[in-house]
Amino acid sequence: MSPANQRHERVGEEIAHEINAMLAGELKDPRLEVSVVASEVRVQPDMKHARVFISVKGTNKEQSDAIKALEHASGYIRRELVERLQLRRVPELHFTLDLSQEHVERIERLLKEMKKDNPPAP
């Protein structure tokens, strides 16, 4: 992996860490009272944009509301990242719902159902 790619990954990890710290207590929006976690951040090579994948435990409405709340707070989050990370340029943040955990849970549920419906042969 090239040093540039390593840097983007490191910056993405640092951004995710700081956003999670903000979610743990600094962001006071009722739409963020459900379990919300920045699961991954992908930073573009030019460092101008970052896709922030957000995992939300809740209903579809709660998930949608949490993404809207984060988009509304993106200016504040970005200013905080400037101070905390001391980067020359903090990327513009784009929040996306991370459905990977839901897919894992769905697959596990389907596998359990298959196992229950088809017991092992004696």
What is each of the regions a protein language model found here?
Residues 1-49, 55-122:
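Charge-rich, low-complexity N-terminal segments
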